[in-house]
Amino acid sequence: MDPRLRAPIFLPILTPETLQKKKQIKGNKTTIYKNGFMLFRSRLHKILNLSGDWAGASAKCSIIWHTLPQNVRLAWSQLAELSHYQDVRKQIAKLERILYSKRLNGHNNYKLHISRVQ
């Protein structure tokens, strides 16, 4: 018998990082957003999903985003930057209240039925 076969040599095997990662629990997931519009759109999609109004959701998000005042859009963008470092759910709730107040103050040139989400 070949002497090399008697003492096997274990070689390191490179495994992809995806196999070593554990599946995240959805409840503890903190998403990192690239910019303010993506954060805004994700929150609005969640609200639209809960209210059942999905007709043209992406177009509505874009229309609403462009009708928001510059300072509100800047606040969403700063919040998206902050999401890289910490959980921003409380701050998102504050900005959603601003969005609701804009909708209730006659800023309604788009058809959107939003139910209040706690």
Curated annotation (Swiss-Prot):
Molecular function per GO: DNA binding
Major place of residence: nucleus
Keywords from the named record: DNA-binding, Nucleus, Transcription, Transcription regulation
Location of the protein in the cell: Nucleus
DNA-binding positions: 29-97
GO CC field: nucleus
SMART domains with a match to the protein in the record: HMG
Transmembrane segments: none
Keyword Ribonucleoprotein (UniProt): no
Note: There are three genetic loci for mating type genes in fission yeast, mat1, mat2-P and mat3-M. Cell type is determined by the alternate allele present in mat1, either P (plus) in a h+ or M (minus) in a h- cell. Mat2-P and mat3-M serve as donor of information that is transposed to mat1 during a switch of mating type.
Role description: Mating type proteins are sequence specific DNA-binding proteins that act as master switches in yeast differentiation by controlling gene expression in a cell type-specific fashion. Required for conjugation and efficient meiosis.
Record's protein name: Mating-type P-specific polypeptide Pc
